[in-house]
């Protein structure tokens, strides 16, 4: 009787188990050598370059904010805490032949003198300038590698998520015109910041992956 019950239970378990999951996790999330070797085995990247500095400066970084018809340029952009980013997800989907790599970056800090050019039909740009220092509780970067594209990071799509909410920031106008223009209405700040981080997503993800895990040779 017991043997019959076990047999029935085994059949029930097999029936409820369904097809095997296509998700395969080849590495522990903190095993960067394993992740690096896995990426290198599926691409042309060179593993193990080192680490991003805790602080570094980029002379000029331009990004677009389409919602506000504006182009922004960060001058002498200082980035802090990029070295604190950590891998929070890494898996292969054997069915779709894609690999997902997510990186969580807590308290990224950006400091720069920022120029804004707002574009309008039939008019020249309105150009403004201000100092800004912003700290972001958590920026989450998810990159999807495609085996059909040889796991090419340089053309892979990265999604940027303000997972920790809006930044804590300080702004100081560089001239009177900018002081009069800057709005104290922050109703649309979430739209601006989503587009801002979208504009920086490739640089943030690709520089971390290439410096910390495997160098794909991207021009960020």
UniProtKB/Swiss-Prot annotation:
Transmembrane segments: none
UniProt keyword list: Disulfide bond, Glycoprotein, Secreted, Signal, Silk protein
Subcellular location field: Secreted
Signal peptide coordinates: 1-16
Primary subcellular site in the record, as a coarse category: secreted
One Pfam family hit: Fibroin_P25
GO cellular component: extracellular region
InterPro entries the record matches: Fibroin_P25
Glycosylation sites: 69, 113, 133
Tissues expressing the protein: Produced exclusively in the posterior (PSG) section of silk glands, which are essentially modified salivary glands.
A GO molecular-function annotation: structural molecule activity
Record text on subunit structure and interactions: Silk fibroin elementary unit consists in a disulfide-linked heavy and light chain and a p25 glycoprotein in molar ratios of 6:6:1. This results in a complex of approximately 2.3 MDa.
Misc note: It is unclear whether the N-terminal residue of the mature protein is Ala-17 or Gly-18.
Official protein name in the record: Fibrohexamerin
Name of encoding gene: P25
């Amino acid at each position: 009787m017991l043997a019959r019950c076990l047999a029935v239970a085994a059949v029930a378990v097999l029936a409820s188990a369904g097809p095997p999951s296509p998700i395969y996790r080849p590495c522990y999330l903190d095993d960067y050598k394993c992740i690096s070797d896995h990426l290198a085995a599926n691409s042309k990247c060179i593993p193990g370059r080192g680490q991003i500095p805790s602080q570094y400066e980029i002379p000029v970084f331009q990004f677009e904010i389409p919602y506000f018809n504006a182009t922004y340029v960060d001058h002498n952009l200082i980035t802090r805490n990029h070295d604190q980013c950590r891998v929070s997800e890494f898996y292969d989907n054997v069915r779709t032949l894609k690999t997902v790599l997510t990186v969580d970056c807590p308290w990224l800090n950006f400091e720069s003198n920022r120029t804004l050019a707002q574009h309008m039909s039939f008019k020249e740009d309105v150009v403004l300038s201000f100092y800004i220092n912003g700290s972001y509780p958590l920026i989450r970067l998810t990159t999807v590698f495609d085996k059909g594209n040889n796991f090419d990071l340089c053309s892979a799509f990265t999604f940027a998520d303000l997972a920790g909410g809006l930044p804590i920031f300080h702004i100081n106008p560089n001239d009177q015109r900018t002081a009069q223009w800057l709005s104290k209405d922050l109703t649309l700040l979430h739209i601006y910041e989503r587009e801002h981080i979208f504009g920086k997503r490739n640089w943030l993800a690709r520089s971390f992956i290439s410096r910390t895990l495997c160098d794909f040779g991207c021009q960020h």
